[in-house]
């Protein structure tokens, strides 16, 4: 299997487990970007608790699913997005207004598009979920 990106593999595992009706999913390898992405998802209630398991290698993450996720994905390549262009990407990626989130990596950290708009920061789009 060709590994495209660690974040892509993690979100693909979550998507597949949600479609299969699983209650939890094991993600490996672990990375800081995946953990921050999961924290944003957890903050909005799309996943339950998650814990990082240190296996003295690349690490694992066990995520509790609550069945609320419809789809999550990665945007590759990571496009630079100005604050004025952000609405165009939100319309393109999400199915409806007030439904789902676009995740950006900014100088202030990894956050959703609403928080980026509030803090008035822009950056690169890394993914979305709804």
From Swiss-Prot:
Subcellular location(s) of the protein: Cytoplasm
Any single Pfam family the record assigns to this protein: Ribosomal_S8
Presence of keyword Cytoplasm: yes
Protein name per the record: Small ribosomal subunit protein uS8
GO terms, molecular function: structural constituent of ribosome
Quaternary data: Component of the small ribosomal subunit (SSU). Mature N.crassa ribosomes consist of a small (40S) and a large (60S) subunit. The 40S small subunit contains 1 molecule of ribosomal RNA (18S rRNA) and at least 32 different proteins. The large 60S subunit contains 3 rRNA molecules (26S, 5.8S and 5S rRNA) and at least 42 different proteins.
Organism of origin: Neurospora crassa (strain ATCC 24698 / 74-OR23-1A / CBS 708.71 / DSM 1257 / FGSC 987)
Family of this protein: Belongs to the universal ribosomal protein uS8 family.
GO CC terms of this entry: cytosolic small ribosomal subunit
Function, as annotated: Component of the ribosome, a large ribonucleoprotein complex responsible for the synthesis of proteins in the cell. The small ribosomal subunit (SSU) binds messenger RNAs (mRNAs) and translates the encoded message by selecting cognate aminoacyl-transfer RNA (tRNA) molecules. The large subunit (LSU) contains the ribosomal catalytic site termed the peptidyl transferase center (PTC), which catalyzes the formation of peptide bonds, thereby polymerizing the amino acids delivered by tRNAs into a polypeptide chain.
BP-aspect Gene Ontology terms: translation
């Amino acid at each position: 299997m060709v590994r495209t990106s660690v974040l892509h593999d993690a979100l693909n595992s979550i998507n597949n487990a949600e479609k299969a009706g699983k209650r939890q999913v094991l993600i490996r390898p672990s990375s800081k970007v995946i953990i921050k992405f999961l924290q944003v998802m957890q903050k909005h209630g799309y996943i339950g608790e998650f814990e990082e398991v240190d296996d003295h290698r690349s690490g694992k993450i066990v995520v509790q699913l609550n069945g609320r996720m419809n789809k999550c994905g990665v945007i590759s390549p990571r496009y630079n997005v100005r604050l004025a262009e952000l609405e165009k990407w939100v319309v393109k990626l999400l199915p409806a207004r007030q439904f789902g989130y676009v995740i950006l990596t900014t100088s202030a950290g990894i956050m959703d598009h609403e928080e980026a708009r509030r803090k008035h920061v822009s950056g690169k789009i890394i993914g979305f979920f709804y």
